[in-house]
């Protein structure tokens, strides 16, 4: 039985969405159990043989600062959910709440794995091959060293290996060109480290990739710093929304366009399904001594259920042990990233 701790109060919609998603998830996973964390009055109506309520008196708001969430709201549903993972009561925690707060609390309670300086946020973006490309970091670390990028690649490889069937996942380093001589000094150094890791058998490094390769599906994993990754994520979400919105407008302009829309409906439906972010919801916070997954803050029930699915698959396939094993194997290359003091938590806008 795999147990997940769910922050039922987080996100833009709170229990109205999270509880509906939890019920659907339990219906689809007979070997799963949920710990529903939140304010008792809001969760009391939910009953299920494989669900238990865990009381939390406070809620981390989407606009709460990291300091407020970490130091003043010590009985928040987000914190109590992550505490279940620390205590061994749950295999993973899932929240749609404030990303900066989630990362700060998770890092404070769970700590980072040996050999990892900073956790990273990893999620999937749809690609032209009908699958998805895993991208990290998506906002946890705005400034990264070459060693950080190597650590992200190692953790990303473990994630994809755990969640997808197939051979060793391919890794690409996001750059302004495919040539090794291009990019900043940090990117060039990261490329050298990734090539060394590939020679040692720690990674399947493809080489440098460009932004369009994320959506071509040229590689399974794209590694970048959190600033670039977050910009790429938000740009792709905005582009997808613009395309879908433009199609709706154009097909409703006049009667002939509406007739064309009826004929093209199956194709349009398939296109919209492939571009629907809800199918890829659920970002992993990698590098911690416990599994934590972040749902999009505006997720509906379908999207939040997908985040639960991701956490369930990660726990079932022993993601944490896989990350530890890869880190141990790559330990000679994972030297201390830099001599700079670690920031408490980088500001992030990933929701």
UniProtKB/Swiss-Prot annotation:
One of its GO terms (molecular function) is phosphate:acyl-[acyl carrier protein] acyltransferase activity. GO terms for cellular component: cytoplasm. Keywords: Cytoplasm, Lipid biosynthesis, Lipid metabolism, Phospholipid biosynthesis, Phospholipid metabolism, Transferase. One of its GO terms (biological process) is phospholipid biosynthetic process. The keyword Lipid metabolism applies. Homodimer. Probably interacts with PlsY. PANTHER family: FATTY ACID/PHOSPHOLIPID SYNTHESIS PROTEIN PLSX, PHOSPHATE ACYLTRANSFERASE. Catalyzes the reversible formation of acyl-phosphate (acyl-PO(4)) from acyl-[acyl-carrier-protein] (acyl-ACP). This enzyme utilizes acyl-ACP as fatty acyl donor, but not acyl-CoA. Pathway: Lipid metabolism; phospholipid metabolism. It catalyses: a fatty acyl-[ACP] + phosphate = an acyl phosphate + holo-[ACP]. InterPro entries: FA_synthesis, Phospholipid_synth_PlsX-like. Pfam families: FA_synthesis. It comes from Verminephrobacter eiseniae (strain EF01-2). This is Phosphate acyltransferase. HAMAP family: PlsX. It is found in: Cytoplasm. Its main location: cytoplasm. It is an enzyme of class 2 (transferase). Belongs to the PlsX family. Its EC number is 2.3.1.274.
């Amino acid at each position: 039985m795999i147990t997940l701790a769910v922050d039922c109060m987080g996100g833009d919609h709170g229990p109205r969405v999270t509880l509906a998603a939890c019920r659907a998830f339990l219906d689809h996973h007979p070997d799963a159990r949920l710990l529903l964390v939140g304010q008792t009055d809001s969760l009391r109506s939910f009953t299920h043989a494989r669900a238990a309520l865990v009381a939390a008196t406070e809620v981390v708001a989407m606009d709460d600062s990291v300091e407020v969430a970490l130091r003043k709201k010590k009985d928040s549903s987000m914190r109590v959910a992550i505490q279940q993972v620390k205590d061994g009561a749950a295999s993973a925690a899932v929240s749609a709440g404030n990303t900066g707060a989630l990362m700060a609390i998770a890092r404070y309670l769970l700590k980072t794995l040996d050999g990892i300086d900073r956790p990273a946020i990893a999620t999937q973006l749809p690609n032209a091959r009908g699958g998805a490309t895993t991208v990290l970091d998506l906002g946890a670390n705005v400034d990264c060293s070459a060693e950080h990028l190597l650590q992200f690649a190692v953790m990303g490889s473990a994630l994809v290996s755990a969640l997808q069937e197939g051979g060793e996942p391919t890794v690409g380093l996001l750059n302004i060109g495919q040539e090794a001589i291009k990019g900043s000094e940090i990117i060039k150094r990261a490329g050298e480290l990734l090539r060394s890791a590939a020679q040692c058998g720690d990674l399947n490094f493809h080489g440098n990739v460009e932004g369009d390769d994320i959506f071509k599906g040229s590689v399974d994993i794209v590694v970048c710093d959190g600033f670039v990754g977050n910009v790429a994520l938000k740009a792709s979400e905005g582009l997808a929304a613009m395309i879908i919105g433009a199609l709706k407008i154009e097909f409703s302009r006049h009667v002939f366009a509406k007739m064309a829309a009826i004929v093209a409906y199956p194709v349009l439906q398939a296109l919209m399904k492939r571009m629907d972010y809800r199918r890829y919801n659920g970002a992993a916070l990698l590098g911690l001594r416990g599994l934590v997954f972040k749902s999009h803050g505006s997720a509906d029930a379908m999207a939040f259920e997908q985040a639960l699915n991701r956490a369930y698959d990660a726990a079932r396939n022993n993601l944490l042990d896989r990350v530890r094993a890869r880190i141990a194997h790559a330990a000679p290359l994972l030297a201390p990233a830099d001599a700079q003091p670690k920031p408490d938590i980088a500001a992030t806008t990933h929701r």
